[in-house]
């Protein structure tokens, strides 16, 4: 088992970790030596990670953000997943607060074609 001692009154503490279920100590050490995950942002406003081998990026914006992270900005709190492959770009969007009753507008830092499929 593992634990991270946050202390009695942590303030502005920052850390990142990845869960590796069913991995041995040797497998965990090997992953640690050459991690697949790249932390793109880890602030109170946004957390973002990119998994290189899977070409997947996950972002949690806890507030609107005009400053792009991984080429993405949002006008409301949003959880965004992106995967790009030879078929194109797949994006998933949801509200991490579960309070939004309207829309979430995401802006990408590049041109994309018309959506092939979307949910209203």
Features from the language model and the residues they span:
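Terminal accessory/anchoring regions of large secretory-pathway or extracellular enzymes
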Residues: 1-120
């Amino acid at each position: 088992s593992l634990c991270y001692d946050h202390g009695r009154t942590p303030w502005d503490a920052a850390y990142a970790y990845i869960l590796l279920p069913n991995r041995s100590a040797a497998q965990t050490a090997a992953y640690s030596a050459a991690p697949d995950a790249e932390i793109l942002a880890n602030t109170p406003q946004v957390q973002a990670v990119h998994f290189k081998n899977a070409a997947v990026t996950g972002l949690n914006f806890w507030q609107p953000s005009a400053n792009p992270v991984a080429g993405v900005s949002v006008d409301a709190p949003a959880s965004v997943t992106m995967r790009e492959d030879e078929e194109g770009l797949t994006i998933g969007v949801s509200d991490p607060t579960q309070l939004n009753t309207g829309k979430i507008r995401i802006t990408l830092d590049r041109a994309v074609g018309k959506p092939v499929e979307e949910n209203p």
